[in-house]
Amino acid sequence: MTFEACTDYLGFFKILPKDWQESIVPVWKNFKASTSGYLLIDNNQIIAGGLVFSKCPPDMLYAENESKAWFNKGFLYLGFIYVIEEKRHQNLGSVWLDNLKKRIPNQKFWLTIEDLKLDAFYVKNGFKYVKSFYNDGIEEAVYTFEG
């Protein structure tokens, strides 16, 4: 298994859930220059990946001021972190995050989650809960990693 910078974004997007694809693919050209992607590859198959944004990502446009505040503090946004279904529960999300932290040492990251059951996963990986806000009545929790 290898951790690689993404060169095949469309290949990565194909492993994402349909609703995630619908939120990134149509606007990708607007974010490509300010976003890096990283993948876990096993036997020439993308098994996990995620995007690192240096400007407000498409799924956070409703909270653009919040995004700007984090970017102004030197944080990068992690989004679209995904492990394919058949490889779940093998610690690959943690492997992806560990490799990212090694690839970009001393970098601060922030992210949001809607699935609050992911709290334990992110805390286990060194992230700290900061606050919550609501988007269309749905709670989103903000987490940071301070490198």
Ranges and model annotations:
Residues 80-81, 111:
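Extended, folded domain segments that form the structural surfaces/walls around functional sites
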Residues 32-80, 88, 136-140:
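Conserved acyl-donor/pantetheine-binding loop and adjacent beta-alpha core of acyl/acetyltransferases
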Residues 23-26, 63-66, 96-99:
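A generic local structural motif
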Residues 102-115:
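Conserved GNAT acetyl-CoA-binding A-motif
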Residues 83, 89-102, 124:
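Conserved acetyl-CoA-binding loop-helix of GNAT-fold acetyltransferases
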Residues 115-139:
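Conserved active-site alpha-helix within GNAT-family acetyltransferase domains
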Residues 1-49:
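Short amphipathic alpha-helix that is part of the acyltransferase structural core
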Residues 144-147:
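Short beta-strand-to-coil "C-cap" segments at the C-terminal boundary of structured domains/repeats
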